Amino acid sequence: MAPAPLGVPEEQLLGCRSRVLSRLLFIAQTALLLLPAAGAGLCPAPCSCRIPLLDCSRRKLPAPSWRALSGLLPPDTAILDFSHNRLSNWNISLESQTLQEVKMNYNELTEIPYFGEPTSNITLLSLVHNIIPEINAQALQFYPALESLDLSSNIISEIKTSSFPRMQLKYLNLSNNRITTLEAGCFDNLSSSLLVVKLNRNRMSMIPPKIFKLPHLQFLELKRNRIKIVEGLTFQGLDSLRSLKMQRNGISKLKDGAFFGLNNMEELELEHNNLTRVNKGWLYGLRMLQQLYVSQNAIERISPDAWEFCQRLSELDLSYNQLTRLDESAFVGLSLLERLNLGDNRVTHIADGVFRFLSNLQTLDLRNNEISWAIEDASEAFAGLTSLTKLILQGNQIKSITKKAFIGLESLEHLDLNNNAIMSIQENAFSQTHLKELILNTSSLLCDCHLKWLLQWLVDNNFQHSVNVSCAHPEWLAGQSILNVDLKDFVCDDFLKPQIRTHPETIIALRGMNVTLTCTAVSSSDSPMSTVWRKDSEILYDVDTENFVRYWQQAGEALEYTSILHLFNVNFTDEGKYQCIVTNHFGSNYSQKAKLTVNEMPSFLKTPMDLTIRTGAMARLECAAEGHPAPQISWQKDGGTDFPAARERRMHVMPEDDVFFIANVKIEDMGIYSCMAQNTAGGLSANASLTVLETPSFIRPLEDKTVTRGETAVLQCIAGGSPAPRLNWTKDDGPLLVTERHFFAAANQLLIIVDAGLEDAGKYTCIMSNTLGTERGHIYLNVISSPNCDSSQSSIGHEDDGWTTVGIVIIVVVCCVVGTSLIWVIVIYHMRRKNEDYSITNTEELNLPADIPSYLSSQGTLSEPQEGYSNSEAGSHQQLMPPANGYIHKGTDGGTGTRVICSDCYDNANIYSRTREYCPYTYIAEEDVLDQTLSSLMVQMPKETYLVHPPQDTTALESLIPSANREPSAFPTNHERISEKKLPSTQMSGETLQRPVWNINRELGLPHPPFSQQPVHESPQLHQNEGLAGREPDCSASSMSCHRLQDHAFDFSRTRNIQDGSEGT
């Protein structure tokens, strides 16, 4: 060794030599590594080449050290990695035609680098963990082919509208920056190509609505920001988005339509936020959603219709929330759900049938809840899960398993019952399943005769290696594995677990009553028992209970425990299913469920009001009632269900609006309408009268009349309308002068002129009026002289014939008044009885239309028929008199003869004379039925046969029929007896018409209302002139002296002048 130079320590010299040698060794090794690449081109130092990768990472060299690379890149280099160096800037131009990817992660770059000509070919640029403060669009415009840009873990604070030039970028990662603001339109230049955006771990507190106008974006991540509220339409514009991740933001509220517009999204991750409720408002529009993860939130409730817009869910994670109950509608609509995680909540209530909609569910996780009762109570909580293969129930404080606990789980293969202190398992509890794996560990089993089956079942199904079960009772078997217990040791010497002896009973009560429910249980153990009452599977805390214990010695000593639940002043909120749970140290037992139903009698909120309305209008009746259960509303008309409006499809019932409509009201709709409210507690009704008003009209057209002098003229004015119109008559546009020859019938609808003379001819006007208007009609009466009468013959018996005709009319009136009055008394009596049976008519006044005078309100309701009209026959018009039927007068010889009537040509005769002359007259029937009847009645009947009685005021239309045309009665009246004695047998012709009194109106087509006749006071005398009727008088032109009949004095007087009524009109 050479001596050390003077002044230089030997140790220092040796150190320098070692460093030089190590560097030379490094250079030699590098050269050896680069030799393989030398054949294809030299690999620049200090990089490593693995074509197409040029790896220059982790060299910790500054930028000036890399200038030598500018022209030394291998020709096939496509990937360049400068990560983990100390690059603070880069302005080195590279020469490569194949470079596509550049990674410069974990450096100290402050801006986006430029690589010269190869920059335009780069498709991937990763600048992770640098100190770039902003995105410069000018720097990015040199990257026209760039598809992936990773700027995560920099110090970028905002994304501006000008941050990105128009480019075909597909992947953008801006996570772990300091971004607080996203300017509107900041991603617009990337909208045609961007597929993935990551903005995790930034400082954004809100997302402006419609900020993402990226129709092709498929994946968006916003995890670990500071977003608290998501507004509606925030993500509108992301039509192709498939996955959205927003974990750990502290989101407390998702407003309605928050995710609207995400029509193709399949995955939504919202874990570790502060959501409190799942509802359809913020799920609106997610029709393609398949995975929803909302674990680690504060969700307390699932709305009944929460899943209406996302019924394609296949996986739902609701674990680690604060759910306490699962209502019946919690999972409605999720028929495609395959995996459901409800673990680590506080569920204590599962409604019956809550899982019945999940027919496709395969995995259900309910670990670490409080649903022991679902297994212990045999409530069939899992009914409907026909496809379930895996059920996790660990950590639910389950103490016993009933034989019905797993009914419906035909496909179950994996059952996890770990961490439950199970004491008893009923035989055949797992018979409904096809278990391949059973996880069970318990040391609390009550090893009595009821558990003997379990040992053999575990062996037969090869589960003895996957379970860890041991006995706790009886004491001499405590701690022993059930697999080691002999079968003869499973005995039942007592019943330590409580047994229910008295179950609460189902009760139906009225609101306000007090209700008592009783539950009794017995146990052979001295272990104290306690009782808990549940309503609809939820524990009742603040209730009034009475508990007592006594010893029961019917089959050995036992402890009997009784609990009485008192419910005072029950209301509708008390309705439900009640159940008692008796518990001691050895387990719990559940009573049957008793249903409490609280009813309330219906009461009306709206009652129908009496209504008066015109024909053709719309009738509207309101009726609403409340009660519990809600009463059913129905309608009746006049105590029945026959609605003319319903048959004609004019009736409309609006149950939601409590309104009953009748369109285009008609007269037949008039009546009493009853609103019936009925529920299980009872029923009641309210009535309203519908009065239909109709303007006056002519039921039958008015017809002109032509009569022969001396005949009786009947002028018909058959009126219709509601209320019944009042009729007045005028003659020749002036007052009608009423004499003893003028009579009115059927409420002035018939004007009868007896012994018509030439002075009676003229224009007669019928004026009908009611509150709705007035109608007029004209009838022209023509009186012609008889061509066959001479003066001598007309003087014979003229006076007697006229007065006999008057007598006939009076007799008819009297007889019909009596018969009709009796009929109306009976009809009115039965109508009132019927109304009292089914109706309670409102007493309020009628509500009249504005155009109807108020005096109509005093006319009463339809339960009392109005004068002149009957409600029950409002649309029926009966005939006044039977037709003549072509009656032909017979002479004394049995052949056709002539009838003598009063004529004397009426030119110079005194029509009020007591003596009248007779002339022969051949009867010719007229076309009008009513005139035929009256004419034949007045002319054909012998005047000798009548017994005249004083007439009475009548209100019946039938009064125009003579008693001779009435059917004989079983009990003849005095009048009929006298008539039978006085009438000659020769006058009782077999052809005389026999018609009942009550058929008159029907045959004439007139309504029931009676006619009003002016009262006539007579002094009746009986006139008999036998043989006169069969004899034809000798009425020659020269003979003026004719036989005269015996004179009779008749005094006619009237209580009311019809002329007064006419003038008043």
Curated annotation (Swiss-Prot):
Residues 41-807 are extracellular. The chain crosses the membrane at residues 808-828. Keywords: Cell membrane, Cytoplasm, Disulfide bond, Glycoprotein, Immunoglobulin domain, Leucine-rich repeat, Membrane, Phosphoprotein, Repeat, Signal, Transmembrane, Transmembrane helix. Detected in all tissues analyzed. One of its GO terms (molecular function) is signaling receptor binding. Its main location: membrane. Residues 829-1065 are cytoplasmic. One of its GO terms (biological process) is negative regulation of axon regeneration. It is found in: Cell membrane; Cytoplasm. SMART domains: IG, IGc2, LRR_SD22, LRR_TYP, LRRCT. LRR repeats lie at residues 76-97, 98-119, 121-142, 145-166, 168-189, 193-214, 216-237, 240-261, 264-285, 288-309, 312-333, 336-357, 360-382, 387-408, 411-432. It is a single-pass type I membrane protein. Glycans are attached at N91, N121, N173, N189, N274, N441, N468, N514, N571, N589, N687, N728. Disulfide bonds join C519-C580, C623-C675, C717-C766. Residues 974-983 have a biased composition (Basic and acidic residues). The keyword Glycoprotein applies. The keyword Protein biosynthesis does not apply. GO terms for cellular component: cytoplasm; extracellular matrix; extracellular space; growth cone; intracellular vesicle; plasma membrane. It is linked to Urofacial syndrome 2: A rare autosomal recessive disorder characterized by facial grimacing when attempting to smile and failure of the urinary bladder to void completely despite a lack of anatomical bladder outflow obstruction or overt neurological damage. Affected individuals often have reflux of infected urine from the bladder to the upper renal tract, with a risk of kidney damage and renal failure. This is Leucine-rich repeats and immunoglobulin-like domains protein 2.
